[in-house]
């Protein structure tokens, strides 16, 4: 067993995808509006089952977790010399929907993750060792925009657009999709839809309640740069995102 640590976390990938989205919008893409975020697997299934007319509105891009997994595997390949099939990539996720998505990826030919662990399970194992730490080393590989994706409104804010709508809670999302299907919100360019209250911080596998978690995230963002990552058209993410 060989452990290979990487910095390709979901927040870093979120910043790359946000930067790509800004480039796409400035170049006149996409054509179908409003675009719907792919970040929540529950919402993707909801659209396919109940709102099939809105499938063309789903943004044609991978999710931050998927992009992070692909980049992490490539980094591990380069570091170890092992073939990709000999490398395991696992995610720590906030909800059961993302556990399922780890094994059945939307829009990809095959899953890019080998499995997923619930945040609460990892947290409980780390609780005692964390208490023994005398000094905490900052390890964030993303800035405000990437870390902000964890709560509702963060993805919209990272796009730096004024015509974005963020909705959380499954019933609220259903009502919004009904309005979009009926053409009642033509001014919107982008929909950030989260099944969980307050976004991913409200996932059932989290330890903290979503409102307290959102407050803690605001504290973590203090002093961070706006973003630490950019989408490079000739960079590491080009062949994955496009």
Enumerate the language-model features and the residues they cover.
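Iron-sulfur-associated redox domains of electron-transfer enzymes in respiratory
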Residues: 1-242
